[in-house]
Amino acid sequence: LRHPARVAACILPCILVMLAGCARSQPATAQAEGKKPMAAVQESSGMLRVTELSLMQDALVVRYSLHGEAPVWVVDQLFSTSAAGYHHLEPERAYVEARDGVLVLTRALLPVPDDIEVEAPEVPCVRKLSPGESLTGEIRVRLPPRQDLPYRDSRPLDLATLRSVKLRIGYLPDVPELELHESKDDVGRPCRYPSFGPAITRQQFADVGPLPMPARTTP
């Protein structure tokens, strides 16, 4: 028979090892539950790649990059217009709408709806993307989200019903027929923009998604 003191001496270290193993496993469990500061995803679609998709406490953040294979003008420089008619470039803005549970974020030239008349269509500014070069962009959609389209009234969107996110970027082939104009916004930042007619017929799109809506981060 073993001496009781010796048996206890053998059992105690084993218990301590088991407890230590449980303590070390807790961070892995928290990580598996998605408790990360940001949710990063990557998915390519031709020239466009989404490099990050995060649902923060105050905004949905989408970061993307564009990679040039042929010379194009990227239509991703949106602006806001004041009551006095002044334009202000909005580097974080995208057109926002919901379609069947998908939050669609668009940076492109949009057609004027047939049921309305406008004095002048909204034409975003453009950036040159040359072969072998890259451009980056960031979109921040403030929460709670709202529809943001150039020819429609803003209205709230129900975040709980949005299951995924789609990104669409417009671009124009660099051809002689493309008419570009030089301008500046209300604080003097330069802007190049195309004529609406030639651009709306030549515009092409790069799409990524739908991507799963990320979990909202905790403060």
Predicted regions and their residues:
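Beta-strand-rich interaction surfaces with strong enrichment in secreted/lumenal proteins
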Residues: 50-52, 123-129, 154
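Low-complexity, acidic Ser/Thr/Pro/Gly-rich terminal tails and inter-domain linkers that flank the onset
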Residues: 28-57, 72
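Bacterial signal peptide processing site
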Residues: 23-25
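Short Pro-Gly-centered flexible turn/kink motifs
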Residues: 127-141
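Short, well-ordered beta-strand segments enriched in hydrophobic/aromatic residues
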Residues: 60-68
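C-terminal motif of bacterial Sec signal peptides marking the signal peptidase cleavage site
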Residues: 19-21
